[in-house]
Amino acid sequence: MTKSELIERLCAEQTHLSAKEIEDAVKNILEHMASTLEAGERIEIRGFGSFSLHYREPRVGRNPKTGDKVELEGKYVPHFKPGKELRERVNL
C-alpha cells in the first residue's frame, strides 16, 4: 500500500473528514515519526510495533557493475520490529 492508497482508503472510511485534512494528518504523522528517528529516539506504537535506529558497521562492499571493492562507512538505518499482536494477526 502506498501513501496515496492509504489516504484514499481513509477518505472512503472517514467521510466526515475532507481529503485535505486526511492527507495533512498522514503527512504530519509520517514527518513527526521521521524527525523523531532523526533525533535518535525510539517510537513505540503498542499493538503494532516499534521503530528504532540500528547501527550498521563499516564494511567492504562491491560495485555490482564493475565488481570493484568499495569501502562502505558505518551508518544508522531505520529498523521496524513488529509487536506481538501484529505478528499474530498476520500469521495466517
Swiss-Prot record:
It comes from the Bacteria. One of its GO terms (molecular function) is structural constituent of chromatin. CDD domains: IHF_B. Transmembrane segments: none annotated. GO terms for biological process: DNA recombination; regulation of DNA-templated transcription; regulation of translation. Keywords: DNA recombination, DNA-binding, Transcription, Transcription regulation, Translation regulation. GO terms for cellular component: chromosome; cytosol. This protein is one of the two subunits of integration host factor, a specific DNA-binding protein that functions in genetic recombination as well as in transcriptional and translational control. Belongs to the bacterial histone-like protein family. Heterodimer of an alpha and a beta chain. NCBIfam families: hip, PRK00199.1. This is Integration host factor subunit beta. It comes from Vibrio cholerae serotype O1 (strain ATCC 39315 / El Tor Inaba N16961).
